Amino acid sequence: APIKGYSVTVXLYIFDCQKWSSNYPHKPNFSDATDPKGPWCYTTDYXGAASVTRSGLRGDEQTPHRHTFSPQSFAGLTTACVKGTGEGYRGTAALTVSGKACQAWASQTPGDVYSCQGLVSNYCRNPDGEKLPWCYTTEYCNVPSCTGGPTGSEYHEILTPAQDXYTGIVEDYRGKMSPDAGLEENFCRNPDQDPQGPWCYTXNPEAXPRYCDVLSVVGGXEAQRNSXPRQISLQYGWQTVHVQSIHAEPRGVDIALVKIAPPAQLTACVITXWGETQGTGEDVQFCAGYPEGGTDPVSLVCLEPCVLAPVLVGVVILPXNDRXQ
């Protein structure tokens, strides 16, 4: 029979004692004939009060939470990020968003470990369909989402230094990622659709992958033909043409008007500009050039007032004593 007057709280086998008022994990059911010799207690080991064949886990590792979900199986497993609500996440993140360490999943024993859920160590998981992977603490886990806006997965420029000036190293990711991910040398890439953009492994063996300092393209659109204003590229070309006639008049000018035949083959070009009409009487004619020097009033940037027709038809050169139009 139990020896009255003892208040021992640890059993002979170094298991925490179950409270006498508790029915978990053992429902009290004993008699004088079945009691062990000496002071005893029900332990938190599921195998029994006096069993040494199954060690079990300490009862304090079952706190502060007990599992209440039912096991299920999920497809589409991921390790680096979260798809949807993360039921298939099998990575090794084990901290909450505020940096709290996760409680070990094995602390749910006695009970089913639910191996189909990948409940390993204290890594973040989502076995019950919560909105994000979680662990037994009070917060959701800090795991990046697999979906979102542009992530730089198509970035293939040759840029190696990471954001904190570490040098990238070559890492064999080809067997794990898409064959067209551009994983050559040690250049910055984003083969896993990381929402923070291109990254690389560094030469520091103790450091995690580093994100690269790559400029992002924001805004802008392709310029359409005849749109105003627009930028164009002027490139040199060479043609051999025949001169039909030369007009050197009026006297006093330093250029001549040359007529060629057949006409030169030119590329169509539309230029939008602005300038001062200075009494020409036409919205498509404006004066350019200062004989005294200075800034030309004609600019190839569309500012106010803009000319109505954005087409430069021709240039008229007059003698030096007249105004150039």
Curated annotation (Swiss-Prot):
Residue ranges constituting the Kringle domain according to the UniProt record: 80-146, 159-217
Domain of life the protein comes from: Eukaryota
Record keywords, A-Z: Blood coagulation, Disulfide bond, Fibrinolysis, Hemostasis, Hydrolase, Kringle, Protease, Secreted, Serine protease, Tissue remodeling, Zymogen
Record carries keyword Secreted: yes
Signal peptide: none
Compartments in which it is found: Secreted
A GO CC annotation given for this chain: extracellular space
Pfam families documented for this protein: Kringle (PF00051)
Record-stated family: Belongs to the peptidase S1 family. Plasminogen subfamily.
Biological role: Plasmin dissolves the fibrin of blood clots and acts as a proteolytic factor in a variety of other processes including embryonic development, tissue remodeling, tumor invasion, and inflammation.
The protein's name: Plasminogen
